[in-house]
């Protein structure tokens, strides 16, 4: 079993609800959370700025050698998810799925 942690980030503290649910569903997994409270909220910022912040958040989490990253931020999930998936060699998941 891969014992590396799963990294989770949000633009603030709201993503702790995702961490709580992940811990409930996968109690054997180690989780690392980063809440970017210094720059919250991300909403209202340009797409380039959001993508830059998200890259920095992922870079920080990557320093812990995670096996996957969960973006617990709707703004980043809808703005930068595709970029982050392309730029990383580990799975990157968002919290906002496709809608009809």
Model region roles, listed by residue range:
Residues 1-100:
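Non-catalytic structural scaffold of enzyme domains
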